[in-house]
Amino acid sequence: MRTAALSTMSTILSVDPLSFPFATDSPFLFGVHHDDRYPKGNAKMGPDASLRGHSIGADFGNPAGWSMYHGEGGVPGFPQHPHRGFETITVTVRGFIDHADSLGAAGRFGDGDVQWMTAGAGISHAEM
């Protein structure tokens, strides 16, 4: 019965171009979109390309089609940092992302995987 009811209405409310950050109806929602085309990696798990033009530690300018973000030691991503009281949803279209947190949980997700993370007080995590 529920399936029949859903099939008679559209769940898509609108289609809009991407903006940064995503416009939302709620002040409690913050949406961002990263579409990086990272170059081949090197033996240290960093990009095998020049970092010239990249502002290490705060690189969001997307020079050459990719950014280091808050990456340290030549590895792009978001090193250990805390959150409290919100959730993040990460969809990996291509490539891989390594997650680790201060509770000892760790994992790798990629190529179509989705990560839904609920942030708790006193817990730090990293996505690299």
Label every PLM stretch briefly.
Residues R2-V91:
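N-terminal, Lys/Arg-enriched amphipathic/low-complexity engagement segments
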Residues V75, V91-D111, G120:
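A short beta-strand-loop-beta hairpin characteristic of the jelly-roll/cupin
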Residues V114:
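Walker A (P-loop) ATP-phosphate-binding motif of ABC ATPase nucleotide-binding domains
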Residues G120-M128:
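Ligand-binding loop in jelly-roll beta-barrel domains
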Residues H81-H83, H99, H125:
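Histidine-centered active-site/metal-ligand motif
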Residues Y38, G95, I123:
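Short loop/turn segments at secondary-structure transitions that flank enzyme active sites
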Residues S19-P21, A105, M128:
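A generic local secondary-structure boundary/capping motif
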